[in-house]
Amino acid sequence: MEQIYSMLGISAEVEAFGNVVLKDLKERFEKIDAVAEYNQAKVLRAMQEERVDGTCFAGSTGYGYNDNGRDKLEKVYARCFGTEAALVRPQITCGTHALAIALSANLLPGDELLSPVGKPYDTLENVIGTVPSACSLMEYGVSYRQVELMENGTFDYPAIREAINEKTKLVTIQRSKGYAMRPTFSVQQIGELIAFIKEIKPDVICMVDNCYGEFVDVIEPSNVGADMIVGSLIKNPGGGLAPIGGYICGKQSCIDRCAYRLSAPGLGQEVGASLDLNRALYQGFFLSPTVTAGALKGAVFAANVYEKLGFRVIPNGTEPRHDIIQAVELGSAEAMEAFCQGIQAAAPVDSYVTPIPYAMPGYNCDVIMAAGAFIQGSSIELSADGPIRAPYSVYFQGGLTWFHAKTGILMSLQKLYEKGLVKI
């Protein structure tokens, strides 16, 4: 391997360091594979139970009436995630869009939205209206309240109890850490939180932002009481093949409203052409457990590499994993740029490009992003990003195969090593 890695620009010293780290990860990788095997069987059973056949891959145009493949895919998602219904559409452009649909469809003027997990992901601030924006929830008369996490990253149950009131209509729970240096929540933790909230107010809608968490465990938040789970098809469930799309799975009453919000009242799920995307959406979902396992191995490897070098990493090298994201606190903008340039240099697409920080819509500071992906913005593919602000943390995720994720981490280390920012 030394020769081919050398041709990619990875030195013998960096490769050797990676191999030392890798020797201790066999047991962790076996556990990841066991989860993937279970989830592969779960997806397979869902497809068989819904009698997926070759006609499901035919696309539709125009209104999209009688699109059997589109409708059956939604049944597959609902069965796999244990929900009454699902909305799985290429017309949902990204995770933020899916969340905006779910929120705006199920909140009316006078209702209150509660986040019991602190500040949401940056792009949702515009959706909610905490960063003023046209068409935000707050502009339409929805109020917002949030409860900060405890210092150790756990839920502040007394404060949550106090925050829930007669106006509380929907509780949003972000599973993954986003651009925060806090733990990602396990499905079990989310289930305990939902049970606590439902005990106080049984009719409240509990929605989980499931981005980056699908198929990391053998159960999903929908199996522990979530009324809706929401995600993006260019993350885990698309398996690297879905070129666009998002999903919302949950109670029929919630999904019906989401479908009306996506299209129009009275139209709902009856319209929405799938064009020629059905095959990719089915095949990507089928491959997702295996692709997610490769990304998880990459995250575990990254945690152990950078922890061994003395950096703060979340999760650490031995903690259980609840999403595919690995945060590394690098301490400087220079180190963030070097890390991301290494990830970009390891990409199959745009490997010659040098990522630099820039202003992105929805973010309140410059952001650097590295992603030489087949699908623009796909974070199940090898990618890294982060806001250029203290403590200068970079967030690594993805890799369509474990071996590509490994190469990306080694290349990120190579760039830091070349700039004298780390010593091996």
Name each model-derived stretch.
Residues 307-424:
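Conserved C-terminal alpha-helix-loop-beta "cap" of PLP-dependent enzymes
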Residues 4-29, 33, 43-49, 53-56, ...:
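Conserved PLP-enzyme active-site core in the AAT-like
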Residues 59:
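Aromatic- and Gly/Pro-rich donor/ligand-binding loops
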Residues 74:
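Generic structural marker for isolated residues within well-ordered, non-membrane alpha-helices
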Residues 87-88, 327:
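Ordered hydrophobic segments in well-structured contexts
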Residues 36-40:
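Acidic, PIN/NYN-like endoribonuclease modules and their adjacent C-terminal/linker elements
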